[in-house]
């Protein structure tokens, strides 16, 4: 049996060149948006979902209370029916600082996933804003920004001040900040995740911001309340495994612009064990495939330029790159065992000998070299120069986790399993302006 892998070579090369183009675009980095004199900063409401987070929630709230922001800031921490001391720790901070509120969900309400928590808080804030609640200073939906920080998140001290001017443009619905891993120095696994986040931020997201296709993450996400209101009573879909990616795509479809701010970051705790990492990445892959349903609407979305729409569709589609690489590797192993014969006319136009070897080497090493250069330049934990080759190989080996998680995701999809987010239809959680005043 003979297998022709010419198509796989061309596909992989196109992907490499596409990301190389994004890297070139990202080299020109505009300065942060700045506010004109006299401009009133929006009211920032930082929402922190928390379920059994007693180990980290206290430090997170302390971090948020210490942020420098000339405008008004409120902190709404949602205890999702925790069974540990999370609620008590939040209540201590609420008693010390009037900007902090505790929203407690009952056992019947809790445990339905992050999307349900965010929707509960959203309805509470929306109704309070429409009612002119004094805790929100009477601000309207266009002047309120709903920020999401995970229970282990740490914003930089000036994050709110840096992000606020991005909302001067009334067409901007959401802004995402960069993500770092604050325990990157604790383990090699955590460092690999830091490389992923920093690399994605500075290699992809900056370029995507320039062409109008910035993506949203689940941590360090800032969204205008008025934009959320255009998505209905539950902006975060309960059935979405990657609710952040889904939300950003629907905002663009609704005509809003999404931005990316690389001038500040949110730090989060990296996973230090393989099992939860595999589970997390499997969910990401499966959620990515779920978002393919957005492709027809994105192709004609009003909230992005032609280049932005092309990038969004391409970004969603390129998740199949892992499948192509997996098939190529499987064929190569089968060939080495003598089961099949592999042929390929890829690079047949390049002269044999040294030119072919150089071309193959460049195509093989260009992605990794670009990624390592980006990380070294922008990381707060850069490697010593003599460590770079070793950890480049380690990162290459680590990247095979995507092959494993893609296989797991495909298995779950074939079995129609979407078990990370509970989706029983039990009705929405009631919220009112009056209830916001009672939360303390």
Where are these regions (language model features)?
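Acidic donor-binding segment of Leloir-type glycosyltransferases
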Residues: 62-111
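Membrane-embedded multi-pass helical conduit in multi-pass membrane proteins
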Residues: 36-38, 316-415
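Catalytic donor-sugar/metal-binding loop of nucleotide-sugar-dependent glycosyltransferases
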Residues: 245-266
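Short aromatic/hydrophobic "clamp" motif used to bind/position activated sugar donors
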Residues: 146
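N-terminal signal-anchor transmembrane helix
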Residues: 20-73
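The conserved acidic donor/metal-binding loop of glycosyltransferases
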Residues: 150-154, 251
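N-terminal membrane-anchoring/stem segments of glycan-assembly enzymes
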Residues: 1-40, 370-377, 402-415, 440
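Long helical/loop segments within the catalytic core of UDP-sugar-dependent glycosyltransferases
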Residues: 101-107, 111-143, 157-240, 282-293
């Amino acid at each position: 049996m003979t297998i022709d892998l010419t198509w796989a070579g061309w596909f992989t090369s196109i992907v490499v060149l596409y990301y190389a183009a994004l890297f070139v675009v990202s080299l020109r980095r505009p300065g942060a948006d700045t506010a004109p004199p006299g401009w009133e900063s929006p009211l920032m409401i930082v929402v922190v979902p928390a379920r059994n987070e007693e180990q980290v929630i206290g430090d997170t709230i302390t971090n948020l209370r210490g942020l420098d922001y000339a405008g008004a800031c409120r902190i709404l921490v949602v205890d999702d029916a925790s069974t540990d001391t999370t609620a008590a720790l939040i209540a201590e901070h609420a008693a010390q600082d009037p900007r902090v509120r505790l929203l407690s969900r009952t056992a019947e309400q809790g445990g339905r996933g992050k999307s349900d928590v965010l929707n509960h808080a959203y309805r509470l804030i929306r109704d309070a804003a429409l009612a002119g609640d004094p805790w929100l200073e009477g601000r309207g939906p266009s002047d309120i920004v709903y920020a999401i920080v995970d229970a282990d998140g740490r914003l930089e001290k000036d994050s709110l001040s840096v992000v606020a001017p991005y909302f001067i443009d009334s067409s901007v619905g959401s802004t995402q900040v960069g993500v770092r891993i604050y325990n990157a120095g604790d383990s090699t696994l955590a460092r690999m995740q830091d490389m992923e986040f920093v690399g994605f931020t500075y290699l992809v997201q900056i370029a995507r911001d320039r062409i109008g296709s910035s993506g949203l993450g689940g941590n360090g996400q800032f969204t205008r309340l008025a934009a959320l209101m255009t998505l209905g009573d539950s902006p975060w879909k309960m059935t979405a495994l990657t609710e952040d990616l889904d939300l950003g795509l629907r905002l663009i479809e609704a005509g809003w612009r999404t931005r990316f701010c690389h001038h500040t970051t949110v730090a989060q705790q990296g996973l230090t064990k393989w099992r939860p990492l595999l589970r997390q990445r499997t969910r990401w892959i499966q959620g990515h495939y779920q978002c393919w349903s957005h492709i027809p609407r994105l192709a004609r979305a009003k909230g992005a330029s032609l280049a932005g729409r092309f990038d969004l569709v391409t970004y969603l589609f390129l998740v199949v790159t892992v499948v192509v690489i997996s098939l190529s590797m499987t064929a190569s192993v089968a060939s080495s065992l003598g089961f099949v014969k592999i042929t390929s006319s890829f690079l047949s136009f390049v002269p044999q000998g040294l030119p072919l070897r150089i071309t193959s080497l460049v195509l093989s090493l260009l992605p990794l070299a670009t990624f390592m250069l980006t990380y070294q330049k922008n990381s707060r934990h850069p490697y010593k120069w003599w460590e770079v080759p070793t950890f480049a190989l380690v990162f290459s080996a680590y990247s095979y986790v995507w092959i494993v998680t893609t296989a797991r995701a495909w298995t779950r999809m074939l079995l129609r399993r979407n078990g990370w987010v509970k989706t029983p239809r039990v009705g929405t959680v009631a919220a009112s302006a009056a209830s916001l005043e009672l939360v303390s």
